[in-house]
Amino acid sequence: FYDRRLPPELAHLPMVESCFDAKAKSRTGALGMWQFNDITAKEFNLDQGVLVDDRYDWKKSTQAAAKYFERLGKRFDYDWALALAAYNGGPNYLAKTMKQQGKDNYWDLKLREEPQNYVPKFLAMLQVAKEKYPYLYYQGAPKFWIVAAN
């Protein structure tokens, strides 16, 4: 995300998508911590074989998510609320809805329930994270953290 000059907060999105569970599977078939569906995974060259599915690979799926947000940012004029809603509900759905309603502000749009609640849910999660872990957000924080887990 840093290398693509994306807002670093977007790297927290898997908390909303999957609680950072790299093996997560949704009721609609989206997989991995970024919850890529088949079509988007294919679009970003994530292999979906019988033995290996790159949507379960945290590194490959994170790289794909960064590319996807780079594209969404460009498409929605770097309005990250719109980009987040597009990530959740689909960019074509969002663009069509914006055109039908004649609105280009996320907060003015009337969307399906899940994308309508997605941005507030993400912002609430960020607020909780910033209050609980303020040292992750001070100016000049390291560009990466090394975390060991067993």
Language model segments and positions:
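Extracytoplasmic and endomembrane cell-envelope/extracellular-matrix remodeling and assembly machinery
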Residues: 3-4, 48-51, 55-76, 81-150
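Short, functionally critical alpha-helical segments immediately adjacent to catalytic or ligand/cofactor-binding
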Residues: 6-23, 83-88
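Short glycine-/small-residue-rich flexible loop motifs, especially phosphate/cofactor-binding loops
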Residues: 11, 38, 70
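Solvent-exposed loop/turn segments at secondary-structure junctions
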Residues: 18-21, 40-41, 90-93, 129
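Short beta-strand->loop
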Residues: 23-24, 55
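Short, surface-exposed glycine/acidic/tryptophan-bearing loops
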Residues: 24-45
